[in-house]
Structure formats: structure tokens, C-alpha cells
Swiss-Prot record:
Family (UniProt): Belongs to the RuBisCO large chain family. Type II subfamily.
PROSITE patterns referenced in this protein's UniProt entry, alphabetically: RUBISCO_LARGE (PS00157)
Protein name: Ribulose bisphosphate carboxylase
Active site: 171 (proton acceptor), 294 (proton acceptor)
Cofactors required: Mg(2+)
Residues engaged in binding Mg(2+): 196, 198-199
Catalysed reactions, as listed in the record: 2 (2R)-3-phosphoglycerate + 2 H(+) = D-ribulose 1,5-bisphosphate + CO2 + H2O; D-ribulose 1,5-bisphosphate + O2 = 2-phosphoglycolate + (2R)-3-phosphoglycerate + 2 H(+)
Miscellaneous: The basic functional RuBisCO is composed of a large chain homodimer in a 'head-to-tail' conformation. In contrast to form I RuBisCO, the form II RuBisCO are composed solely of large subunits.
Lineage: Bacteria, Pseudomonadati, Pseudomonadota, Gammaproteobacteria, Thiotrichales
Keywords: Calvin cycle, Carbon dioxide fixation, Lyase, Magnesium, Metal-binding, Monooxygenase, Oxidoreductase
Stimuli inducing this protein: mRNA expression is constant at all CO(2) concentrations tested, however more protein accumulates at 15% and 2% CO(2) than at 0.15% and 0.03% CO(2) (at protein level).
NCBIfam families attached to this UniProt entry: PRK13475.1 (NF010002)
Subunit structure: Homodimer.
Gene that this polypeptide is encoded by: cbbM
Length: 463
């Protein structure tokens, strides 16, 4: 059934929709299935995402029609064989405020703008490319309670432009028992700032939380005494049940508090698999604790290889609305994860109060920033190029292999990361860097050959 007479109005202008502030706007890439018209399918998406049914129903009234989602712009040839561009305006009244406080929730918003429309049979691809949240909605999402300035404060740095936080993931990601896990933490903390659990590290029988966390808390205290520097740990509290997440969080904070280090703790939540409910549980139950959003599994909906799902930029915006203090953004083409240089807009959208996306100019109206967390195949040699592309180093970076694969020690690996940042910031020649960074060339010769050809001769190292 062609519903374009009701669910499309191409006379609407984006300028007026934005100025009125009564709609959430979404840009999609759409490829209709064979035998279907572009506007016909676009209108079906708007109908399926709002008030529509596959037939006319007698219960529809004038108010219902007043909250129809409307297609307001199309360009059938925008992406060639991959499909065309369409934009839909969703009335704010369609979205769901909480009973307890009137805040909007991402779960409902997501189910509406990228829910049943993903399973429609009359398209071969429907991908969300960008969306614009109006002021009246932005101000009623939780947003972050803490941000990177809170971590800089713990580290004794300026709370504005406090710089790069050198971190790692304990490797191997699974299989370490409590004692070697805590030792690995201590060894890295002698040179680096920040350690996170990897996404599957939690409460396995071979490394129970109630055994390993006390040892990690003690290792942090020893490392701080040995170095005279504050250290940070991001503990995985992900679980299916909100009470279990809270139990884990309270336990972790209690163990680190024995050394006065509860402010040195972040909570890692696997936000894709546990969903907005898990993220919000941590955000609201522990508003003083940095909320570290790990996106494991996100590629199922964000991979550029898919005609479905959403672009990573949309996922970043959803995470900020949920209240993530920091989220993994990938490595923008400099590590092992799927991505490209222009993904620096992901970081800008997270950290700035206003940012131009691919289709919409988003204002955040004072919402706290979300930190870009850079992870996945990075090491000291890859960092200068990454910083140059991004334009700053106010990020958390976790290098697992890039730290524990350093030829000298995990501590040297951590030191080399900080030296890479200092080298980029001062414009120093990497080949002439201090020892730990210089030894990274020998630690990761494959990267060195690609990024710094001729390094062997300059350092006097031969194959």
C-alpha cells in the first residue's frame, strides 16, 4: 500500500523544521527492493516508525494524524547503486519520557527511529546516517555525569586541556588468574596511567572478582607509592540484572576505598550488549564514577560493510545522550579496527558543544562531553599520525599489545605512549625520541617499516 499521500510532505523545509524545534530529524540511506518506488518505501518507513499500519484502520483520528512522521526530503540517486537519501521528521510528541523524572530514554527513541523499519520487506537496505535532536529533547536526556576533566583532576593535571591518558588492556584478554593479572597491572602502572578490563574480563571461575579486585587495588596503591603518580582502573561491571551491576560496582569501590582510591576507579559497561538500560543503571547508580562505555558487538549494526543499521556517528550520539563519560570510537584508520581518517568527526561530536555532522548541525546545549577512547591495534608508533589527524591528544588510549608487546617491559610500553604524545605535541623527530619510544621501533618493526621507512639505518638497527 502506497502511503506517500499521508506520510510524505516534500514541501516542508529543513530550515523551518529546525527553527521550530518540534521534530527529531533523521537522515537515512534507502535502497528499495525490486518493484517498489523510492518515495513509496520511504513513506512506508515513516509510517512503520510512527503511526502507520499496513492497512487503513478505523481508530485513526485527527490527533493521530498530527503526530505522523513525515518524509520531507529525498534524493533517489544520492548513493548510486547503494540507494538514495531520505530524511524523516519525527514529532517530539512521539517520544517517551520517564514516569519517574520526565527524562527521555534512548531505548524508546532507538526502537522508533531504527526499529521495525529494519525488517521491512520492501527495501534491500535502510541505514541511519545522522540525526538531529532538538533542544527541548537534548535537555531532557541524562547525558554524562562525569567526564575526562574528573580523571585529569585525579591525575593532578589541569582540568582543561589536561592531555593524553596513556592506558592499556591487560593481555591476554582471558586466561590470567588473579596473581598474574594483578602483577600485569602493577608492571604497566610503573609507566602508564590507565588500565581497563577487556570486555569479557569479569568474574570467571579462574579469576573471580572477589579475589582479583583486592589484588588490583593493592597493586594500584603500590604503583602509586613507587612512582609518586596517581593511577586509574576501569572495572567491568556489566551484567544482565541491574542489581548485579550495582553489587559489582559497590564491591569494586569498596575495595579501592580501602586505600583511599575510590575516585581512581571507572566502571566499564559493555553498552551494546547490555543496552541503554545497563548504561543508565551505571550512570544513575554511580553518578560520581566515570562511565566507560565499551561498544563490543557494535559492528553488527555500525559496520560500513552493511546496508542496514547505523553509521558509527549515530551510535556516538546515542551514547552521549545515554550518559557515557567515555566511549570507544575506534582508531580512525590508524589501528586494526574498521574505520577511516574522517572519523575524527566522531570525536568532535562527542567532545564539543556544537558540531557539524554529515547532514545536521547538532547543538548539545551545555551537556557534558563524552571522551573519545582510542583502542584496537595501537602502539607508540601509530600515535603521532593519529594525533595529527585528530588535532589534539585529549583522549584515553588503551594499547594492549602496544604496551605488553614492548621489547623492554610493560612499563616501558606505557612510557613510550606518553613519549609519543609529547613527541607529537612538541614537533620532535620520532627517531630522536627518548629510549622507550625509540625501542618501540624494535618492538613493532612491521609498523616501523610502514610508518617510518629508513628507521633501521637511523637507529643503527639491522634486520
Amino acid at each position: 500500500m502506497d502511503q506517500s499521500n499521508r506520510y510524505a510532505d516534500l514541501t516542508l523545509t529543513e530550515e523551518k523544521l529546525v527553527a521550530d524545534g518540534n521534530h527529531l530529524l533523521v537522515a537515512y540511506r534507502l535502497k528499495p527492493a525490486a518493484g517498489y518506488g523510492f518515495l513509496e518505501v520511504a513513506a512506508h518507513v515513516a509510517a512503520e516508525s510512527s503511526t502507520g499500519t499496513n492497512v487503513e484502520v478505523s481508530t485513526t483520528d485527527d490527533f493521530t494524524r498530527g503526530v505522523d512522521a513525515l518524509v520531507y526530503e529525498i534524493d533517489e540517486a544520492a548513493f548510486g547503486d547503494k540507494g538514495g537519501l531520505m530524511k524523516i521528521a519525527y514529532p517530539v510528541d512521539l517520544f517517551d519520557p520517564n514516569l519517574i523524572d520526565g527524562h527521555y530514554n534512548v531505548s524508546h527513541m532507538w526502537s522508533l527511529i531504527l526499529g521495525n523499519n529494519q525488517g521491512m520487506g520492501d527495501h534491500e537496505g535502510l541505514r541511519m546516517l545522522d540525526f538531529l535532536v532538538p533542544e527541548k529533547m537534548v535537555k531532557r536526556f541524562d547525558g554524562p555525569a562525569t567526564d575526562i576533566s574528573d580523571l585529569w583532576k585525579v591525575l593532578g593535571r589541569p582540568e582543561v586541556d589536561g592531555g593524553y591518558i596513556a592506558g592499556t588492556i591487560i593481555k591476554p584478554k582471558l586466561g590470567l588468574r588473579p596473581e598474574p593479572f594483578a602483577k600485569a597491572c602493577y608492571d604497566f602502572w610503573l609507566g602508564g596511567d590507565f588500565i581497563k578490563n577487556d570486555e569479557p574480563q569479569a568474574n570467571q571461575n579462574f579469576c573471580p572478582m572477589e579475589v582479583v579486585i583486592p589484588k588490583v587495588a593493592e597493586a594500584m596503591d603500590r604503583a602509586q607509592q613507587a612512582t609518586g603518580q596517581a593511577k586509574l582502573f576501569s572495572a567491568n561491571v556489566t551484567a544482565d540484572f541491574h542489581e548485579e551491576m550495582i553489587k559489582r560496582g559497590e564491591y569494586v569501590l569498596g575495595e579501592f576505598a580501602k586505600y583511599g582510591n575510590e575516585k581512581h576507579v571507572a566502571f566499564l559497561v559493555d553498552g551494546f550488549v547490555t543496552g541503554p538500560a545497563g548504561v543508565t543503571t551505571s550512570r544513575r547508580a554511580f553518578p560520581d564514577t566515570y562511565l566507560h562505555f565499551h561498544r563490543a558487538g557494535h559492528g553488527a549494526v555500525t559496520s560500513y560493510k552493511s546496508p542496514m543499521g547505523m553509521d558509527p556517528l549515530c551510535y556516538m550520539k546515542l551514547a552521549r545522550l545515554m550518559g557515557a563519560s567515555g566511549i570507544h570510537t575506534g582508531t580512525m584508520g590508524y589501528g586494526k579496527m574498521e574505520g577511516h581518517n574522517d572519523e575524527r568527526v566522531l570525536a568532535y561530536m562527542l567532545e564539543r558543544d556544537e558540531c557539524q555532522g554529515p547532514y545536521f548541525y547538532q547543538k548539545w546545549y551545555g551537556m557534558k562531553p563524552t571522551t573519545p577512547i582510542i583502542s584496537g591495534g595501537m602502539d607508540a608508533l601509530r600515535l603521532p599520525g593519529f594525533f595529527e589527524n585528530l588535532g589534539h591528544g585529549n583522549v584515553i588510549n588503551t594499547c594492549g599489545g602496544g604496551s605488553f608487546g614492548h621489547i623492554d617491559s610493560p612499563a616501558a610500553g606505557g612510557i613510550s605512549l606518553g613519549q609519543a604524545y609529547a613527541c607529537w605535541k612538541t614537533g620532535a623527530e620520532p627517531i630522536e625520541a627518548p629510549r622507550e619510544f625509540a625501542r618501540a621501533f624494535e618492538s613493532f618493526p612491521g609498523d616501523a617499516d610502514k610508518i617510518f621507512p629508513g628507521w633501521r639505518e637511523k637507529l643503527g638497527v639491522h634486520k
